[in-house]
Amino acid sequence: MELKGRTFLGYRRDNGRVGIRNHVIVLPVDDISNAAAEAVANNIKGTLALPHPYGRLQFGADLDLHFRTLIGTGCNPNVAAVIVIGIEPGWTGKVVDGIRATGKPVEGFWIEQNGDHNTIANASRKAREFVQYASELQREPCDVSELWVSTKCGESDTTSGCGANPTVGEAFDKLYEQGCTLVFGETSELTGGEHLVAARCANDDVRERFQAMFDRYSAMIDRHKTSDLSESQPTKGNIEGGLTTIEEKALGNIQKIGKRCRVDGVLDKAETPTGPGLWFMDSSSAAAEMVTLCAASGYVAHFFPTGQGNVIGNPILPVIKLCANPRTVRTMSEHIDVDVSGVLRREINLQEAGDQLLEMLLRTANGRHTNAEALGHREFVLTRLYESA
């Protein structure tokens, strides 16, 4: 597939970014504001609440990550407008101010000294205005280079490294050549193959930052593991699917970054890239956490190759699933957007599989719902660094 000159119909935001969805979200700052946020979403059709279990008595780097994730989620160009609800005005205002910098409509409400009833009523009135505002926004032609695409795999097996992951790599190579902004992560799943990623880094500075980030993550795992990471890395499902060591899993994981991409930069969790290219983000390998971090970093579409089958979705980031395992494609067909099992049967080659994935990306960018969206998978899971005070 020739991508040069290809366009899609996206939503141009005030800060210049382009989204492929037009959500109005109700974002709770903390766990005790979930009920109010969900009540607003129940009141106003066209809004989406993002409940989560955190936001109280966090501190230090963990609190910084909490704010960065919430603000980044609201700033994502797939979001047209945001209602923020918190228990008190200070932290609520911090999230509102961070999102307001994008120029999009955002309003904050707090429950202290107002109560649930008044907060829900006032937030619902503003949410109705935001939904009507969003409903009048129009898609416009945008160059394919304006797409920000993330990737993370899940429930991997031998078909992942042989079929689905290299398919993502083929697509990434072509998107990279067009100047798209791409990201991969899953720090622990590079174990044993980290030298291959380091060799792909654009310069010594990027290489040193990547190695430092990998070493920091490895040290954290060493501090907290027992004798090994059995049943975690690789998972029991990975082992049953034929991946018996973390090194095997890593070599398959790295297939997702293609052959011609170089690693242009390194991101902390939920950090926004500063330019196009392929970025590495320090992140967990837990699917819902990683995809949530990608959304908070500003990515608008996600490639999710799976072997044994994973049902992950996200409230604002469309997750495009592809699979090369014919059994999974048959038994979990409602979850798979792109069937690339033909690669293993030698019915199609990897370039053709990559083109199928790119075609699905453009269809998704133009408004087609992914299977995860259609099935209502909206996993929104925040990453924690340590326990609360």
Curated annotation (Swiss-Prot):
Which reaction equation describes what this protein catalyses?
A: (2R)-3-sulfolactate = sulfite + pyruvate + H(+)
Q: Give the record's keywords alphabetically.
A: Cytoplasm, Lyase
One GO cellular component term noted in the UniProt record for this chain: cytoplasm
Q: Where in the cell is it found?
A: Cytoplasm
Q: Where are the transmembrane segments?
A: none
Kindly give the InterPro entries that the UniProt entry links to this protein.
GD_AH_C (IPR048332), GD_AH_second (IPR007392), UxaA_altronate/galactarate_dh (IPR052172)
Gene Ontology terms for molecular function: sulfolactate sulfo-lyase activity
GO biological process terms, semicolon-separated: D-galacturonate catabolic process
What EC number(s) are associated with this protein in UniProt?
A: 4.4.1.24
User: What does the UniProt function comment say about this protein?
Assistant: Together with SuyA, desulfonates sulfolactate to pyruvate and sulfite.
- Please report which protein family the annotation says this sequence is part of: Belongs to the UxaA family.
Q: How does it assemble?
A: (2R)-sulfolactate sulfo-lyase is composed of a SuyA and a SuyB subunit.
Protein name (record): (2R)-sulfolactate sulfo-lyase subunit beta
**Gene that codes for this?**
suyB
